A protein has these predicted regions:
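N-terminal signal-anchor module of multipass membrane proteins
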Residues: 17-140
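Membrane-interface helix-loop-helix junctions at boundaries between adjacent transmembrane segments
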Residues: 138-231
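Short coil/turn and helix-start
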Residues: 417-422, 436-437, 454-458, 472, ...
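Internal active-site segments that recognize and position negatively charged phosphoryl groups
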Residues: 205-206, 213-266, 270-274
Length: 537
């Protein structure tokens, strides 16, 4: 309570005149020691092997440190000239450090199965040092007292859960962080009599940079696609995210936002599947990265509705936004993983309108089941109970972890032969993914598709490349196709191919026994695997 009082006094006074008057005998560091230590720590990271191994990363660190140091010197000179004291107070908010712990758990679990996460850890630490330094200097530049706490942690970790720039473009990562904090500082409005930031800082930076990457067709500069697709390498990732989400839901009452977003996506996907005959998302009811986003990206209390019904509408709109953007991005030829990022800033803009519309409802009808005093103030527990039941049911139906209809290549081949919506395009997409993983069978299949020109435009040179790749992987049918342009020989996947084809978005099945492998293949509708005549390599 005393801490909050000190924070309010500091915020009110901002940069305060020094009661001792101007300092003539040299400079007084005062509170500038804090950003100086942070900048010095960032400078020291330059000498680590992770930074030294790439020149662009190295010069990105040097440039970021130089900019921060110059900014600090400028403010220090100015404050001494004006005899001002730049203040800060320590305020620890539970939503910040709880989200920090949740995100660390996720990075640790995910990184155990996808090691680039651990390799990226030092760069995340550098981003945190940069973020704290930048945020402090920005506040003091605006002659405002700085509130020191865990606030930058969830911002930086959220950004890194969805988008990293590759080493050769790493300076863009620092720029993205700077944009996020500047948006928090400058893009504000009056809400309930207080000046607050409009956008979730991480979502603002992610949304803006996602739009630029799409417009410039430069997604390859980032790890975005890999991040979105490797979450499922961690076993039972949906259950893991669900359990982490329950902690946040219980402590901060965000169940209506996250739960309704998920339920909306489940419902829309089920309706699409029933109508068209194929899954809406390629191999899941909700992509794992989207499931992560609806738990950690849209649930910021500062940039989401305050009313229960408003939270419900916010979650529904996020679900509908992701659902629509997936198709829109796909039709534009853009990577679909941006779907979860682009709609958040737009939803943040709608927050006041949503709350105003909800508060204008005076009816005592069904809408009021979302009142805060429902069940003696324990409405959130009731909402959580509903969400738990929904997740349990969807898991029992195979809609979260485990085998999904879209994991089966024979399913997509049958759907393509029946000319179901987008099925041929997705079949080629899946085979391309597996061929890139050096699945010999998939490469031969792609060669056949490009030679025949039935579901893709005919391209003989492309076909030869795929046949050559498959032949190098010792797939005999591909070698024959490579030598004779008139052939389109097929064969069943070899055992090594199955270890890649049946991974269901997870780790390769290199340690599975042959019996386990063929049982899984049979379960995935590979008919040859259900018989005793098996083709092994």
């Amino acid at each position: 309570m005393a801490t909050n009082a000190r924070r309010r006094r500091s915020a009110a006074h901002g940069a305060q005149p020094n009661p001792s008057g101007p300092v003539n005998a040299g400079f007084a560091l005062g509170n500038f020691k804090l950003p100086l230590i942070l900048i010095a720590a960032l400078l020291l990271l330059i000498f680590t092997s992770r930074v030294q191994q790439n020149d662009v990363v190295l010069w990105s660190f040097v440039s970021a440190t130089a900019v921060l140091a110059a900014w600090l010197v400028y403010l220090l000179v100015l404050s001494n000239r004006r005899a001002e004291i730049h203040d800060f107070s320590i305020v620890l908010r539970s939503q910040h450090y709880v989200q920090l712990l949740i995100q660390i758990c996720l990075f640790t679990y995910w990184g155990y199965y996808w090691r680039p996460v651990y390799d990226h850890a030092l760069l995340i630490i550098a981003q945190l040092l940069f973020a704290y330094s930048f945020d402090i200097l920005l506040a003091w530049s605006r002659r405002r007292a700085y509130t020191l706490g865990f606030g930058p942690f969830p911002i930086i970790l959220s950004i890194n859960l969805f988008l990293w720039f590759r080493d050769d473009w790493f300076y863009m990562q620092f720029l993205m962080i700077a944009v996020g904090f500047m948006g928090k500082e400058y893009v504000r409005w009056q809400r309930e009599g207080r000046s607050v930031h409009i956008f979730n800082p991480s979502a603002f930076a992610l949304g803006l940079f996602s739009a630029v990457l799409i417009l410039t067709n430069t997604t390859s500069l980032t790890w975005g696609q890999e991040i979105a697709s490797t979450l499922t390498l961690a076993p039972n990732i949906y259950t893991f995210l669900f359990l982490l989400g329950l902690i946040v839901m219980y402590l901060f009452s965000i169940t209506l936002v996250a739960g309704m977003a998920a339920i909306t996506l489940f419902a829309c996907g089920a309706l699409y599947n029933a109508t068209v005959g194929v899954p809406y998302f390629l191999d899941s009811e909700i992509p794992a990265a989207v499931f992560l986003g609806l738990h950690l990206l849209i649930t910021d209390p500062s940039t989401s509705p305050r009313t229960p019904l408003g939270k419900t509408l916010f979650g529904v709109l996020y679900g509908l936004g992701v659902f629509g953007l997936y198709t829109l991005l796909d039709s534009l030829g853009a990577p679909t993983f941006y779907d979860k990022l682009l709609c958040v800033p737009l939803l943040n803009l709608s927050v006041i309108a949503i709350d105003r519309a909800v508060r204008s409802i005076k009816s005592e009808t069904l809408l009021n089941v979302w009142r805060a005093d429902w069940l003696g103030g324990r409405a959130n527990l009731a909402h959580m109970s509903v969400w738990v039941m929904v997740f349990v049911v969807m898991t029992a139906l195979g809609k979260t972890d485990g085998k999904h209809t879209g994991d089966s290549l024979p399913f997509w081949e049958q759907a393509c032969s029946n000319d179901l919506s987008n099925s041929c395009q997705r079949l080629v997409q899946l085979k391309t993914t597996y061929c890139n993983d050096n699945t010999a069978w998939a490469c031969n299949e792609l060669g056949i598709h490009f030679r025949q020109g039935l579901i893709v435009d005919r391209n003989d040179s492309q076909a030869q490349e795929y046949f050559g790749q498959s032949c190098e992987l010792k797939f005999k049918a591909a070698c024959a196709n490579l030598l004779d342009d008139s052939l389109v020989l097929k064969d069943d996947p070899h055992e090594l191919d199955l270890r890649l084809l049946l991974r269901q978005g997870g780790l390769n099945l290199m340690n599975a026994s042959s019996n386990e492998l063929y049982e899984r293949a049979c379960d995935h509708d590979w008919q040859f695997a259900c018989s005793s005549n098996r083709n092994t390599l």
